[in-house]
From Swiss-Prot:
The gene is fusA. GO terms for molecular function: GTP binding; GTPase activity; guanosine tetraphosphate binding; translation elongation factor activity. The lineage of its organism: Bacteria, Pseudomonadati, Pseudomonadota, Gammaproteobacteria, Oceanospirillales. It comes from the Bacteria. SUPFAM superfamilies: EF-G C-terminal domain-like, P-loop containing nucleoside triphosphate hydrolases, Ribosomal protein S5 domain 2-like, Translation proteins. Gene3D superfamilies: 3.30.230.10, 3.30.70.240, Elongation Factor G (Translational Gtpase), domain 3, P-loop containing nucleotide triphosphate hydrolases, Translation factors. GO terms for biological process: ribosome disassembly. This is Elongation factor G.
Length: 706
């Protein structure tokens, strides 16, 4: 079966937004218009359309489906049919890892902002991640019909807060209750969508007099931005004073793909205005898989040679598993982005991260209103595989004879843990299975059993993250469980440097044990870390002349690392420690790896307490958006929680307070903030760093851990 859509007509995009910017409605409208345009013959009247949308909402596809495939030919059927794969991204900061993972497999992104609240703290986080992966993006300013909507304020915020080089290709026609449509600056016409049939039709009209001046000003800026794409366009612009429609679009496209500019459009998804033009923009200005940088990976050789995989069907198969979802009907769905080659159902492939062979059962593609089983997928495709056994998020799937690891995904360590206990015996068995499935789906969520108490402990990125896990246990897996008090993931470190001997000798007839090391234990510096900011442990060997044979050095490192997982103050893992093996001795017969591992752990156990060990606590970056009249209460409360206010900004809904607060003080904050501000304030929180805990906290932690 040959490829239906040529690769240059593919668009893999994400719709990214802050929680309340209207992403779900925007996505729903995208599915609505594309679903209709693809099956336009089947819809004879409005009723069928709306039924389909309600059913869609009941099934909640925009929330649960990790990737949806739809088709679009343009508002005026002016394009050949393009295939748009939409990858869903969550809006809440507890799921930042999910956003980052989805940005990894996108080629372009549409960032949805609210016309009245503008750039929110979360938007900044997502924008930073999109910069990191160099994702070309365009912005849709939504909710232009809302009270307080101000398109030009949002444009200003994009520049000020995100440093975005924005180029509006539309301006709004009216706002709030008077929002009528948009002015298209390329055609220099007004666009009015037909409200009677949900915006399926539109008309181009002359620009009203009161907007002519503003439209001319922004058009000039847009044409200049397009002209800067090349010398040829600039010469043409300087000669003629304007550019043709085709030249403007070509210039804007080129600069968008090079991440030099961000195009901005506006509308109201709820009122069926503007989303249709966003879809046209995706085709005209977002990249196809062949227009982005070829993905890099490590070859399966000893040197970890870097290789690239071009978006090409004839190249060896390589794909990234970017999300695992549990489906009540088919079991585990593994969503993959195919970067190169072709995969057929029934094929055997290799999971290069886990070094395991896998067989693909079935392959399905999610469409806006159905699930289609397909026989094969090609480079650039996004689909879900059924039947993969040991694949987790971030794994690479590749050709058995051409192995490559596309990336080693770094997942942050959880910062909060709670104990969960099933309410009944039948729940016990179901809970184990359910938690296993949820952990497979989400690598930033961990499950373990406490060896001393036998309790099941779940850990995640924040209170909301764990609340949602518990909610899913109840809703999807029908498991009722009680939740314990949240526990904080403390760490320990050292502030001084010591040298410590470790000697393990056992001689009792026959073969004995002999390991002897001298270790330098010292704080890990920024210089030691170099570019790897996330490094928490470093081992070095200064052994010369073989006083400790080379083959035992890895055992010394292992012994040191494992012992550092049991801190000296309250048993928490020790981080930011550098251990150097600088001397030792061995025995020809009695020395072995185990003896050196034990000697090394003895040296750490004795040496670490002498190196001025301290307890570290996770500190969170907190942003609170509050009406001005509650500012005093909110600030006072943050101070009581040992918070340090870093600064304040104005926002349309009051003030934004930026602070750092220890996680231990943030439990239950959502409820407290609601009652202090009559439910009018909101906050976001993300992990910032580990900092030394004050003595009162250290005492409490030691007493709690007995």
């Amino acid at each position: 079966m040959a490829r239906k859509t040529p690769l240059k007509r593919y668009r893999n995009i994400g719709i990214v937004a802050h929680v309340d910017a209207g992403k779900t409605t925007t996505t729903e409208r995208v599915l609505f218009y594309t679903g209709l345009s693809h099956k336009v013959g089947e819809v004879h009247d409005g009723a069928a359309t709306m039924d389909w949308m309600e059913q869609e909402q009941e099934r909640g596809i925009t929330i649960t489906s990790a990737a949806t495939t739809c088709f679009w030919q343009g508002m005026n059927k002016q394009f050949d049919e393009h295939r748009i794969n939409i990858i869903d991204t969550p809006g809440h900061v507890d799921f930042t890892i999910e956003v980052e993972r989805s940005l990894r497999v996108l080629d372009g992104a549409v960032v949805v902002l609210c016309g009245s609240s503008g750039v929110q703290p979360q938007t900044e986080t997502v924008w930073r991640q999109a910069n990191k992966y160099e994702v070309p993006r365009m912005v849709f300013v939504n909710k232009m019909d809302r009270a307080g909507a101000d398109y030009f304020m949002v444009l200003d915020q994009l520049k000020q807060k995100l440093g975005a080089n924005t180029v509006p290709i539309q301006i709004n026609w009216g706002a709030e209750d008077d929002f009528k449509g948009v002015i298209d600056l390329i055609q220099m016409k007004g666009i009015l969508w037909d409200e009677a049939n949900h915006g399926m039709n539109y008309e181009l009209v002359e620009i009203p007099d009161e907007l002519k001046e503003s439209a001319a000003k922004y058009r000039e800026q847009m044409v200049e931005a397009a002209a800067e794409a090349s010398e040829e366009l600039m010469d043409k612009y300087l000669e003629e004073g304007d550019l043709s429609e085709a030249d403007i679009k070509a210039g804007l496209r080129r600069r968008t793909l090079d991440n030099e500019i961000v195009l901005v459009t506006c509308g109201s998804a709820f009122k069926n205005k503007g989303v249709q033009a966003v879809l046209d923009g995706v085709i005209e200005y977002m990249p196809s898989p062949t227009e982005v940088k070829a993905i890099e990976g490590e070859l399966d050789d000893k040197d970890g040679t870097i290789a690239t995989r071009e978006a090409d069907d004839s190249a060896p198969f390589a794909a990234l598993a970017f999300k695992i979802a549990t489906d009540p009907f088919v079991g585990t769905l593994t969503f993959i982005r195919v970067y190169s080659g072709v995969l057929k159902s029934g094929d055997s492939i290799f999971n290069s991260v886990k070094s395991k062979k896998e067989r693909v059962g079935r392959i399905v593609q999610m469409h806006s209103n159905s699930r289609e089983e397909i026989k094969e997928v090609y480079a650039g495709d996004i689909a879900a595989c059924i039947g993969l056994k040991d694949v987790t998020t971030g794994d690479t799937l590749c050709d058995l004879n051409d192995k490559i690891i596309l990336e080693r995904m770094e997942f942050p360590d959880p910062v909060i843990s709670v104990a969960v206990e099933p309410k009944s015996k039948p729940d016990q068995e179901k809970m184990g299975t359910a938690l296993g499935k949820l952990a497979q789906e989400d690598p930033s969520f961990r499950v373990k059993t406490d060896e001393e108490t036998g309790q099941t402990i779940i850990s995640g990125m924040g209170e909301l993250h764990l609340d949602i896990i518990v909610d899913r246990l109840r809703r999807e897996f029908k498991v009722d469980a009680n939740i314990g008090k949240p526990q904080v993931a403390y760490r320990e470190t050292i502030r001084a440097s010591v040298e410590q001997e470790g000697k393990f000798v056992r001689q009792s007839g026959g073969r004995g044990q002999y390991g002897h090391v001298l270790l330098r234990i010292e704080p890990l510096t920024a210089e030691d870390k170099g570019e790897d900011e996330d490094m928490t442990f470093k081992f070095a060997s200064e052994i010369v002349g073989g006083v400790v044979p080379k083959e035992y050095v890895p055992a010394v490192e292992k012994g040191a690392y494992e012992q550092l997982q049991n801190g000296v103050i309250a048993g928490y893992p020790m981080i930011d420690v550098k251990v150097t093996l600088f001397d030792g001795s061995y025995h020809d017969v009695d020395s072995n790896e185990t003896a050196f591992k034990v000697a090394s752990s003895m040296a750490i156990k004795e040496g670490a307490p002498k190196a001025k060990a301290v307890l570290l606590e996770p500190v969170m970056k907190v942003e609170v958006v509050t009406p001005e009249e509650f500012m005093g209460d909110v600030m006072g409360d943050l101070n009581r929680r040992r918070g340090l206010v870093q600064g304040m900004d104005d926002s349309p809904s009051g003030k934004i307070i930026r602070a750092t607060v220890p996680l231990a003080e943030m439990f239950g904050y959502a409820t407290d903030l609601r009652s202090q501000t009559q439910g009018r304030a909101s906050y976001t929180m993300e992990f910032a760093d580990y900092e030394e805990a004050p003595s009162s906290v250290v005492e409490a932690v030691i007493n709690q851990n007995g």
